[in-house]
């Protein structure tokens, strides 16, 4: 059954002007920051990719928006979390798995990606707001945060690299079969090295390395000025300032732009359905 109301993501355009977004991606460094996120929950509007919802549920952190893009594997990441989903809003793409409508999200916000031919044709007739599709939930979250008007965007768990061979905050370990190959599920993936925020080289998957480049282009295209990455070991991403989570409040006050308390309250996660 679907009790969710469905809206266009563009309905929220610039509604969060001047506020701070925290985008939670699924990398292992997320685990270092869970307690800090909890302690500072009122400082951010939280966007979480669907893969981290189980980790957040276990830690009682309710995101304001859950961002879902995978066309196929969404169901397994959300199974059994329907009660938790009812507390959060969903941002999905027109191509996302329709199983999302059965997950009892509070509200659904639909994004129409620009590089989908069908959507392009529709948009010509319909003037739908089409957004750059990132191809991943993390990129969709970034695009959404920019369109919604956030002036600061902070990432946690955006590692795009392995930490002692751990791939995700959920604890999955990479199955390395050689210096250049690993197995993911049943697929063999090429491993490459990329520059880390520490200046060293770190191992990552070849498709992640390509995603890093895509992400850098997206940051340029979206003209994002204040994007922060709190990873302690992950890939260096051009256009993002690397700041540890603990340094964020100090960092903002020293630049004369302190955290603005979150407003636009009717969309907040902990507000219940009426």
Model regions and ranges:
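Acidic/Gly/His-enriched mid-domain segments of enzyme catalytic cores or analogous surface patches
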Residues: 1, 57-148, 219
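Flexible inter-domain linker/hinge segments
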Residues: 1-16
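Short, polar loop motifs at secondary-structure junctions
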Residues: 50-54, 92-98, 231-235
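Glycine-rich phosphate/pyrophosphate-binding loops
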Residues: 52-56, 60-70, 148-169
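Acidic, Ser/Thr-rich peripheral helices and adjacent loops at domain boundaries
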Residues: 69-71, 83-86, 171-187, 248-253
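Polyanion-binding loop/helix "lid" in catalytic or ligand-binding cores
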Residues: 135, 183-234
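Terminal amphipathic helices with adjacent charged low-complexity linkers/tails
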Residues: 239-251
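Conserved small/polar residues in nucleotide/adenosyl-binding loops
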Residues: 265-272
């Amino acid at each position: 059954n679907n009790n969710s109301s469905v809206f266009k993501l563009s309905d929220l355009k610039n509604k969060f002007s001047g506020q701070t977004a925290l985008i939670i991606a699924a990398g292992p460094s997320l685990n270092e920051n869970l307690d800090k996120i909890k302690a500072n929950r009122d400082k951010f509007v939280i966007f979480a990719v669907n893969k981290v919802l189980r980790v957040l549920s276990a830690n009682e952190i309710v995101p304001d928006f859950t961002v879902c893009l995978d066309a196929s594997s969404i169901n397994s990441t959300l199974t059994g979390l329907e009660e938790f989903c009812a507390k959060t809003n969903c941002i999905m793409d027109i191509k996302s798995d329709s199983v999302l409508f059965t997950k009892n999200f509070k509200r659904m916000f639909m994004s129409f990606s620009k590089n989908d031919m069908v959507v392009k044709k529709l948009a010509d007739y319909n003037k739908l707001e089409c957004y750059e599709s990132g191809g991943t939930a993390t990129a969709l979250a970034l695009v959404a945060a920019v369109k919604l008007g956030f002036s600061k965007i902070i990432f946690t768990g955006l590692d795009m690299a392995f930490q002692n061979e751990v791939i995700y905050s959920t604890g999955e370990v990479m199955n390395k079969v050689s210096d250049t190959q690993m197995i993911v599920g049943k697929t063999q993936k090429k491993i490459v090295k990329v520059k880390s925020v520490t200046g060293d080289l770190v191992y990552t998957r070849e498709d992640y390395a390509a995603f890093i480049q895509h992400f850098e282009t997206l940051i340029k295209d979206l003209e994002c000025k204040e994007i922060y990455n709190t990873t302690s070991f992950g890939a260096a991403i051009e256009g993002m300032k690397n700041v540890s989570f603990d340094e964020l409040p100090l960092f903002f006050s020293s630049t004369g732009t302190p955290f603005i308390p979150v407003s636009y309250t009717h969309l907040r996660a902990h507000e219940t359905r009426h």
